[in-house]
Amino acid sequence: MKEQLNQLSAYQPGLSPRALKEKYGIEGDLYKLASNENLYGPSPKVKEAISAHLDELYYYPETGSPTLKAAISKHLNVDQSRILFGAGLDEVILMISRAVLTPGDTIVTSEATFGQYYHNAIVESANVIQVPLKDGGFDLEGILKEVNEDTSLVWLCNPNNPTGTYFNHESLDSFLSQVPPHVPVIIDEAYFEFVTEEDYPDTLALQQKYDNAFLLRTFSKAYGLAGLRVGYVVASEHAIEKWNIIRPPFNVTRISEYAAVAALEDQQYLKEVTHKNSVERERFYQLPQSEYFLPSQTNFIFVKTKRVNELYEALLNVGCITRPFPTGVRITIGFKEQNDKMLEVLSNFKYE
């Protein structure tokens, strides 16, 4: 076994609603608001597509997901040779890390961000430099100070998970202009579709200026396909060619591909869902206590508090399962009825 595995632990999902009911003696419904899933679910066209292809389950998928690749290529106006799919972004991150990193290499990222950047670097015996957050978001200037000619990968998450904060187009453009051109910069935009701020980066446009800027997106969040696992990277043709060597032959299932194509085609449904999310998100920031809420461009809100366990349990007592962190609680934005319950708790909670 690799010795570095002793530094890590397997991913631990939160307790199920049933287990939480037993642990806390809760009666009534519990709502899972801990994993940033799209509670509205996928487009109805997704269910139609799945039903239409159920008789194909005994076939292996078409390797490389060519139908979905063509759809993404048209949607983003990028060449198909620049797209690679994974079974969720978890697998994409794993493939990139495995293809790029060798023992002793170094990655640079943020201290409080998606944990798989760190996890996969350690698996490959690489070193990890984690720069502290600044005002709850990525400190791009601080990260630049740690990047040099020998850096192997830079991971940025925009908007950031778990804080929900973002950096703008000008900041990313300036950052990329100062990174050595041979150092890959991976920009994880898993929550891109929820963004409403106009100065959010046009990363696809920046890729025309910077060959080392690579973009990650997923169908797990706004498109509502977390259970089917489809994510992808848009990168240079050369990078995709090499990373494709790492990709398992049939990693995205046949049903997942059909579902993702159907979801992508129904942009009207996506707009409706993301609009509902932005309306409900704004309700949280109307509270007088919103000074404790980091500004979010996602479908979740990070609530800062020194009394993490107390807030987690207070929300649990009104039927809402959230995600505790050392410095606060991450809340997935739910339906109006669920949000009403959480807003009542948040408006009466003592944060200090």
From Swiss-Prot:
Cell membrane keyword on record: no
Cofactor section: pyridoxal 5'-phosphate
Cited PROSITE patterns: AA_TRANSFER_CLASS_2 (PS00599)
GO BP, sorted A to Z: L-histidine biosynthetic process
Record-listed E.C. numbers: 2.6.1.9
Catalysed conversion reaction: L-histidinol phosphate + 2-oxoglutarate = 3-(imidazol-4-yl)-2-oxopropyl phosphate + L-glutamate
Keywords from the UniProt entry: Amino-acid biosynthesis, Aminotransferase, Histidine biosynthesis, Pyridoxal phosphate, Transferase
Molecular function terms from GO: histidinol-phosphate transaminase activity; pyridoxal phosphate binding
Modified residues (N6-(pyridoxal phosphate)lysine): 221
Transmembrane segments: none
Coiled coil (residue ranges): none
Pathway given in the UniProt record: Amino-acid biosynthesis; L-histidine biosynthesis; L-histidine from 5-phospho-alpha-D-ribose 1-diphosphate: step 7/9
Pfam families reported for this sequence: Aminotran_1_2 (PF00155)
Superkingdom, taxonomy of origin: Bacteria
Subunit text: Homodimer.
The family this protein is said to belong to: Belongs to the class-II pyridoxal-phosphate-dependent aminotransferase family. Histidinol-phosphate aminotransferase subfamily.
Protein's name in the database: Histidinol-phosphate aminotransferase
